């Protein structure tokens, strides 16, 4: 038999990244796909599966007893750990930008569309999210993008506007490690979910149409989408359950709140 045919989707460097990630994490195929999608946007499930087959990593190694290794348990985060990210979308009016935030534990999600991805836009988006959430947010996680943190060559008198909002609200701003974008994979997956539910499925004549549908989708997601990770609860129901368990971390009763930025 000859050598396995080379990928027509992935470069040699991208294949090396995918295989190294698989061998290091021992994660299932779908988890690898979600984590690597931010680094390799054109990646698909079949392409990743074929890549693993070519490199002999399509099957996870067996443990000492001949069993598959136990799944690694994700680190538990208290409610209020908030990844924030930026995504590009194409519309009739040109390139637009989505700022997205999702609570890692409650899964409550917020997003806004903007024509520009400026520092002040990111900062004001964060302010609106923090004002809307009915509980304390101790930590915000972002990548090293210019919208979220100063770059090496920049001098910003008074500091970065995103960091100023964090200080104002008493929030710790953490950054993902360079070349480790999968550490912010949850919000990357939410980016993908939003795109699949909006711009990849519908044609919008104006960005106002996109805005309206985006906010309607998020309201339905927060209040009607029952999630397996929340044991069948919606994000809003989970927040209300946390209110009953630990009201001290809340700033107000969430029971009758509508979890949307413009409601």
PLM region spans:
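C-terminal domain-tail junction helix/linker
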Residues: 167-171, 192-263
